[in-house]
Amino acid sequence: MTRKEVKVQLNLTRFFMLLLLVPGVPGAAAAAMQTSEPFVGVQLERIVTSEPRPEIIHLAIVDPKAAGIRFLVTPSNGDPNGAQPGDPNLETTRETTLQFITRRHARLGINGSFFTFVKHSLDTNNVSLVISDGHVVSPLDPRRAWVFNITPDNHAQIRKVTASEVGEPDSQLHDAIAGSDLLVKRGKVVAPTGSKFDDSHPPRTAVAVTRDGRLLLMTVDGRQSGFSEGMSLQEVARFLVAHGAVDALNLDGGGSTTMAIADPHPRIINFPSDHKPDGEAGEPRAVGVNFGVFARPNPDYQPLPPIRTAASH
């Protein structure tokens, strides 16, 4: 669909204060932010910017210490192909983030790890470490050793993992997803630059941890000219630092980038970039791994108003 207008209620104060702290954050010249609290311990922000290019960003801020909060990474598919000779032993079965939160009865979800496409199959292997509920789903690739992890006692962390730690009870690896690049380390932007992947502006999904232990789940839409045009890794990192990140990791992006919510009816709240059969953007992608948040409903919740587009009229 052609997106010609975005109508939002303005709530600029907090966002501009953050921009003053971290120069170069996209949206410094024109930004609008909406905030809601759909669940106990979960705050949801939608930020619409026009500089240096149009962006629509969704940020979920999760307090792992809040009552009722728990997490889940996509588990193994149980090797549905069996142990016959030549069996590819694929690790997970792809599904959209919306399908994942619906089937698992989670309240919020984002896409997770990079994965391989297998022709004529929804079964897939994932790139580097995936752990679900303490069970190793995908082995560690030392070239992608930075992971996002939820410990057994619900602490969020971003850490570098060694092969000897995987499968060890003392490692505290419980629900873990490997990413591609470390974006923020100890509050400093460390995102790489120089390659096409680093500096281009696709949709992005990222995760971060704040100094007080909160979890930041971020999506920025892209590949939709004039509506939302994506971010470089450096821009994502600066945005997350502006929101208090001390450590941050890049996850799978592009057409995989999705955030879904069940408030209470499951729905996708961002704008995926893959094309529908009619050629327009908005088709959710089935991915190898998703990350889900379980939480208690907030009785005082007021949903964010929908983003209006030309197709809404």
Predicted feature residues:
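Bacterial N-terminal signal peptides
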Residues: R14-G27
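Short, conserved active-site entrance elements at the starts or edges of catalytic domains
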Residues: Q172-G194
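Broad, structure-driven detector of short, well-ordered beta-strand segments within folded domains
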Residues: W146-P152, V207
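Bacterial N-terminal signal peptides that target proteins for export
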Residues: K4-F16
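Short, solvent-exposed aromatic-acidic interface loops
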Residues: T74-N81, T162-G167, V220-S225
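Zymogen propeptides
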Residues: A29-D141, W146, H155-Q157, P306
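Conserved, well-ordered active-site substructure
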Residues: K119-D141, P192-V246, S256-S312
